[in-house]
Amino acid sequence: MTKPIRRRDFLRLAALGGSAAVTAFLQACADAGIDPATVAPTIALPTPTTAPIQPTADTSPTLVPQEPTMTAPLPTAVPTQTAQDGTARIAFVKTTDRAGGVRQAVELLGINPVAEKSVFLKPNFNSADPAPGSTHPDVLAALVAMLKEMGASKITVGDRSGMGDTRQVMETLGVFRLAEQLGFDTIVFDELAAEDWVMVETPAGHWQQGFPFARPVLDAGAVVQTCCLKTHQYGGHFTLSLKNSVGLVGKRIQTVDHDFMNELHSSEHQRRMIAEINAAYTPALVVMDGVDAFISGGPHRGELASPGVILAGTDRVALDAVGIALLRYFGCRTQAAQGRIFDQEQIARAVELGLGVDTPEKIEFVTSDADSAAYAETIKQALLAG
C-alpha cells in the first residue's frame, strides 16, 4: 500500500511546477486509475552548483527520476561553514575528557546554528558495544547540555542500529534513562510509520531506486551529528561522519519490497553510496569523538588506539579527512591507509557532490592551547602527506 502524499508535499509540487505541473500530475493519475492522494513522494536531489569539479559521466545531471518528483527540501541547517577563501574550520582539542573536550571544541567554532530551533541529534548507536563501538554517554550528555545552553527549542535523539534491534541497543546503552534525566525526546527509526520515510535519489547515483531517508531529520530545524573514530571491516573502510549517516536510511520500509542495507553492503559501489546518503541533508554541527579509536576491525569491535582528541566542524569531508589522517598516524594498515586521503571513495564521491572541501590545503585547524596546537600541526602534516 502506498503512503498518502502530504498536503505540504503537494503544495511544494505546485510551487515548483505551477498549475500546469499539477494538472499534468492529476491527469496522469486519472489515466492510470490512481488516487492522487496515495502517490508516494520522491525527492530528487539537484546537482550541486558549487561542486568543486566539473560534471563527468559519473556525475551527469541529465539523469532524472520518473514523475512525479520533487526537489530536495531546504537544508535542515546552516550551510557547511567555510571561510571566504573556501577553507573549512576544524576545532581540534587534545584531551581524554570527553565532556570537557566536546564543550571546548564547539566553543572554538564560535557558531550557534541551533538557537530557537528544534534539533535532531544523530549519534552512533550501530551496536550496544562501548565507545568507540558506539557513542559514549559522556559525549551525548555533553552535547545535549550544550544544545540546551545554545537555545535549542527541542532536542530529539534517534538512530537505526546496524547490529541488533535498535530499541534494545538504545536500552542497553542507557539512552532512554539519559533522556529522562536530561529532557530530550527519542526516536527508534525501526519503528517509524510508512509516511515517515521519504525516498531520495541523487544525480547519477549508485542506489538502484534511491533510498528511504528518515523524515524527522528533514523536518528538524537543525541537525547535529556525533560520530566515532574507527575503521570499518565490512566494506566501508572507515566509519566517521559520512558513514554515520547510514543510520538515517531505512533497512526496509512498508511501501517498498527491498532490503536497502543488503543492497548497500553487497554493492561494489558501497563507499560511493555512503557519500550519496549525505546529499540528503546538511548538518549544522558535527562532533567526532577520537579519545579512543579502532585502527583495524570495526565498527563494533577492533584494535584499539587512544588518539586522545575531540574534533568539531560543519564540513563532513574535512572532518573525515582529518579522521583518516589520525587513523593512519596511529598505525592503521587497512584499506583506509591506502592511497591518498582525498582519493578514498567516500571522500571523492562526497567532493563530487559538493559536500565539502576538495583538497587538504583548505582545512584550517582551530586550537586554544599549545599542546593541541602542536598535536594539530603533526596531524596536519600527515593529512597533507596523505
Regions found by a protein language model. Give the residues of each.
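N-terminal and secondary-structure boundary signal
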Residues: 2-5, 9-25, 29-39, 43, ...
